[in-house]
UniProtKB/Swiss-Prot annotation:
Keyword Transmembrane: yes
GO BP annotations, alphabetical order: detection of chemical stimulus involved in sensory perception of smell
Residue ranges crossing the lipid bilayer per the database entry: 26-46, 55-75, 101-121, 141-161, 199-218, 239-259, 273-293
GO cellular component: a single term: plasma membrane
Family as reported in the entry's similarity comment: Belongs to the G-protein coupled receptor 1 family.
Protein name per UniProt: Olfactory receptor 10P1
Glycosylation, residue list: 5
One GO MF term: olfactory receptor activity
Record-linked PROSITE patterns: G_PROTEIN_RECEP_F1_1, G_PROTEIN_RECEP_F1_2
Cited function: Odorant receptor.
Membrane side Extracellular: residue ranges: 1-25, 76-100, 162-198, 260-272
Residue intervals annotated with topology Cytoplasmic: 47-54, 122-140, 219-238, 294-313
Membrane topology: Multi-pass membrane protein
Length: 313
């Protein structure tokens, strides 16, 4: 049955924002501008953490990996979104193209969850167990955490994509979204959704709620350590360093939780798309801005890089 559907189903149709024609033009330019800023900002973070000796610590190593994920993440989604915004009609996407986009989307989303958790662990060890920092966060340990993040994403994506795209679909279904996200595609399956729905809910709990709980636990302990510091200046420095990561975590996990955990019965297609647009397009742009504006080391490295590029008088 599934095989027959796949051979007679050459493409899905992505609704995009074709039902909101008045917004398509303005949204096109906003998304394009945000995408360009995202590419520039994350590329700059990668460059700074690579060339600046002051940023060769585990914290900035994880930040560089996060920027790499953000670059791939937006590039998987935004170009097709721009094409959809430039068309007055739903755009076709092949069965294989939809599966590939979802696969990459899941790999990068899960990897980002794991990386944000690793960054919280880095801050916890640096502040609460400084004497063990070089041991617990050695280069080998950091590489292992990053490798595990990617491997976890690959395994999860392979499982979900295999389950979802083995289901039967009706002819030429319209996905009420601007990307091949898990829930909108899964809802279009004509039968056999139960196992995939259980898999998605399990993954949501494991990769959103558990990492978020670990991050919150880390920061509760960090807050206790900050309050125990005698020096006001030390407290401000530590809080400034941690607040950037906390803000990024709140943006990412907040919008992802609302999208995947809230009851679907009362949700609307427009609300789903707006929320997804925020965490897939807006958040990757905000991350480098947040880290640059709120982190003195990054700002200092940026000024130093600019001075080096200026021609001598």
């Amino acid at each position: 049955m599934a095989g027959e559907n796949h051979t007679t189903l050459p493409e899905f149709l992505l609704l995009g924002f074709s039902d909101l024609k008045a917004l398509q033009g303005p949204l096109f330019w906003v998304v394009l501008l945000v995408y360009l800023v995202t590419l520039l900002g994350n590329s700059l973070i990668i460059l700074l953490t690579q060339v600046s000796p002051a940023l060769h610590s585990p914290m900035y190593f994880f930040l560089r990996q996060l920027s790499v994920v953000e670059l791939f993440y937006t590039t998987d989604i935004v170009p097709r979104t721009l094409a959809n915004l430039g068309s007055p009609h739903p755009q076709a996407i092949s069965f294989q193209g939809c599966a590939a986009q979802m696969y990459v989307f899941i790999v990068l989303g899960i990897s980002e969850c794991c990386l944000l958790t690793a960054m919280a662990y880095d801050r916890y060890v640096a502040i609460c167990q400084p004497l063990r920092y070089s041991t617990l966060l050695s280069p080998r340990a950091c590489m292992a955490m990053v490798g595990t993040s990617w491997l976890t994403g690959i395994i999860t994506a392979t499982t979900h994509a295999s389950l979802i795209f083995s289901l039967p679909f009706r002819s030429h279904p319209i996905i009420p979204h601007f990307l091949c996200d898990i829930l909108p595609v899964l809802r279009l399956a004509s039968a056999g959704k139960h196992r995939s729905e259980i898999s998605v809910m399990t993954a949501t709990i494991v990769f959103i709620m558990i990492p978020f709980s670990l991050i919150v636990t880390s920061y509760i302990r960090i807050l206790g350590a900050i309050l125990a510091m005698a020096s006001t200046q030390s407290r401000r420095k530590v809080f400034s360093t941690c607040s950037s990561h906390l803000l990024v975590v709140s943006l990412f996990f907040g919008t992802a939780s609302i999208t995947y955990i809230r009851p679907q019965a009362g949700s609307s297609v427009t609300t789903d798309r707006v929320l997804s647009l925020f965490y897939t397009v807006i958040t990757p742009m905000l991350n480098p801005i947040i880290y640059t504006l709120r982190n003195k080391d990054v700002r200092r490295a940026l000024r130093h890089l600019v001075k080096r590029q200026r021609p001598s008088p």
